């Protein structure tokens, strides 16, 4: 039991280092993806090409989230594997899980992770949105106040986009202007995205793995990984766009709820808007896996345990 706990702590340490490193290295793609998703139809791409330093605005929020999420992931997944393991005599809970039980454990762990990172995702979105307000074209696209609230339009006070650059000032501003609700915006879309992520990734990976099972080489592994990432992004990008919009500083003035957000994007901006930022998200997803695995392996060796245990 002591050895199992020791291995778990080492896994958490290696996972945390890998998660923070991966988050930092791929954050420019996250910045560009989120920036594009926040833009209304017809906004020039150049709007989200500011100084290079802006590409890391909001990275601190995601790094804090990555650290906490990793701890939560290992502990939650370990507990779920133990609960779902039918063979109580087996100490290796993970290896004895069947495909469906493994999917259930992964999905539930993903939902718990999503609930944890929602406040940090909101902070990140606020910081990225505020980093773009220096661009004059963006300032012209503030919410329009309507005389009467309808499903198509929301009649409330327009919420100006504030200029915030640091993590703690962002938290303070969000609480003062929008209250505690500012940290849980986009919860519905985030949970649905996580469920879709887990199920689609599991299904797509299995399908591509079987399709290329005749080729037992490194190339087939790379192809399987890229194909899975492409499928994942293509099928979940609309939910990701809605999530970003619902987490924006002026979401409450523009959308009544998640369904209204989806409807207005479709009617006012067109179907293509649901796939905004997909190229940058694909780049991030494609690179993240390799970076995380490599760093995790190296830290595992330094800590003196097998990363495959």
Curated annotation (Swiss-Prot):
GO terms for cellular component: mitochondrial inner membrane. The chain crosses the membrane at residues 12-32, 47-67, 100-120, 184-204, 222-242, 285-305. Belongs to the mitochondrial carrier (TC 2.A.29) family. GO terms for biological process: mitochondrial citrate transmembrane transport. It is found in: Mitochondrion inner membrane. Its main location: mitochondrion. Solcar repeats lie at residues 6-83, 97-211, 216-302. Disulfide bonds: none annotated. The keyword Mitochondrion applies. One of its GO terms (molecular function) is citrate secondary active transmembrane transporter activity. Coiled coil: none annotated. Keywords: Membrane, Mitochondrion, Mitochondrion inner membrane, Repeat, Transmembrane, Transmembrane helix, Transport. This is Uncharacterized mitochondrial carrier SCRG_05595. It is a multi-pass membrane protein. InterPro entries: Mit_carrier, Mitochondrial_sb/sol_carrier, Mt_carrier_dom_sf, TXTP-like. It comes from Saccharomyces cerevisiae (strain RM11-1a) (Baker's yeast).
């Amino acid at each position: 039991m002591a050895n199992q706990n020791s291995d778990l702590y080492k896994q958490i340490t290696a996972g945390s280092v890998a998660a923070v490193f991966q988050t930092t290295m791929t954050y420019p793609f996250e910045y560009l993806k989120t920036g594009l998703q926040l833009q209304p139809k017809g906004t020039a791409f150049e709007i989200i090409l500011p100084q290079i330093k802006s590409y890391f605005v909001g990275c601190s929020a995601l790094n804090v989230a990555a650290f906490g999420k990793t701890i939560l992931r290992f502990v939650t997944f370990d507990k779920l594997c133990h609960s779902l393991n039918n063979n109580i005599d087996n100490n290796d809970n993970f290896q004895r899980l069947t495909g469906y039980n493994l999917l259930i454990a992964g999905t539930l762990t993903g939902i718990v992770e999503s609930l944890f990172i929602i406040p940090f995702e909101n902070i990140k979105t606020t910081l990225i949105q505020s980093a773009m307000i220096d661009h004059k074209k963006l300032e012209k696209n503030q919410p329009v106040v309507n005389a009467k609230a309808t499903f198509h339009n929301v009649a409330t006070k327009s919420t100006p986009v504030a200029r915030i650059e640091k993590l703690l000032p962002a938290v303070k501003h969000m609480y003062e202007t929008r209250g505690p609700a500012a940290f849980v915006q986009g919860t519905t879309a985030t949970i649905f995205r996580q469920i879709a992520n887990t199920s689609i990734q599991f299904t797509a990976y299995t399908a591509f793995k079987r399709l290329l099972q005749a080729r037992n080489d490194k190339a087939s592994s790379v192809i399987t990984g890229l194909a899975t990432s492409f499928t994942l992004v293509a099928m979940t990008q609309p939910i990701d766009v809605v999530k970003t919009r619902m987490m924006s500083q002026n979401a409450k003035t523009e959308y009544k709820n998640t369904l209204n957000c989806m409807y207005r994007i479709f009617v006012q901006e067109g179907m293509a808007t649901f796939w905004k930022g997909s190229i940058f998200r694909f780049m991030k997803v494609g690179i993240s896996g390799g970076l995380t695995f490599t760093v995790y392996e190296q830290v595992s060796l330094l800590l003196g345990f097998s990363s495959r245990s």
